[in-house]
């Protein structure tokens, strides 16, 4: 099965040569997602909860555009800039995954823009 590009309506243009998501053989791969506006400016600069909510809502749009739901998520890669935000990020994260949780990892690192606090990349398997 060929790869399909997933670009939800209203998506901003990426900062680099990639798309928000791809679908291949029932698997959705969501690119690393940050809390950006339409012009790639960071939203909610000092608010890890608001950034996490925006990131996960954006990821949900990509997965729904591909025909799935957040319940289809099997793996998340989470990148945060400061461990002090870990609990706040997890609080919002848990709202998006109330049932069985997907596998994940979380590391502290620098992100592409200084005001970005969290970035998440996702894999989801859509049931056929």
Curated annotation (Swiss-Prot):
Q: What does this protein do?
A: Involved in pyrimidine catabolism. Catalyzes the deamination of 3-aminoacrylate to malonic semialdehyde, a reaction that can also occur spontaneously. RutC may facilitate the reaction and modulate the metabolic fitness, rather than catalyzing essential functions.
* Family, similarity comment: Belongs to the RutC family.
Q: What is known of its domains?
A: Contains a hydrophobic cavity in the center of the structure and ligand-binding clefts between two subunits.
Q: Which GO terms describe its biological process?
A: nitrogen utilization; uracil catabolic process
Q: Where are the transmembrane segments?
A: none
- For this protein, what is any one GO molecular function term? deaminase activity
Q: Quaternary form?
A: Homotrimer.
Among InterPro entries, the record links this protein to: RidA_CS, RutC, RutC-like_sf, YjgF/YER057c/UK114
Query: So what does this thing catalyse?
Result: (Z)-3-aminoacrylate + H2O + H(+) = 3-oxopropanoate + NH4(+)
Q: What class of enzyme is it?
A: hydrolase
Q: Which NCBIfam families match?
A: RutC (TIGR03610)
Classification from the root reads:
Bacteria, Pseudomonadati, Pseudomonadota, Gammaproteobacteria, Enterobacterales
Cited PROSITE patterns: UPF0076
Name of the molecule in the record: 3-aminoacrylate deaminase RutC
Q: Which UniProt keywords apply?
A: Hydrolase
Give the EC number(s) listed in the UniProt record.
3.5.-.-
> What is the organism of origin for this protein?
Escherichia coli O6:H1 (strain CFT073 / ATCC 700928 / UPEC)
Pfam families (UniProt xref): Ribonuc_L-PSP
Entry GO CC = cytosol
């Amino acid at each position: 099965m060929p790869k399909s590009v997933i670009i939800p309506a209203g998506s901003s243009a990426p900062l680099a040569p990639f798309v928000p998501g791809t679908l291949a053989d029932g698997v959705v791969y969501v690119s690393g997602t940050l809390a950006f506006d339409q012009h790639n400016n960071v939203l909610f600069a000092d608010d890890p909860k608001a950034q996490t909510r925006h990131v996960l809502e954006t990821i949900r749009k990509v997965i729904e555009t591909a025909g799935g739901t957040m319940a289809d998520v099997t793996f998340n890669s989470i990148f945060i800039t400061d461990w002090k935000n870990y609990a706040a990020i997890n609080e919002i994260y848990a709202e998006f995954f109330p049932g069985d949780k997907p596998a994940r990892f979380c590391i502290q690192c620098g992100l592409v823009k200084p005001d970005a606090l969290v970035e998440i990349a996702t894999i989801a398997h859509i049931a056929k």
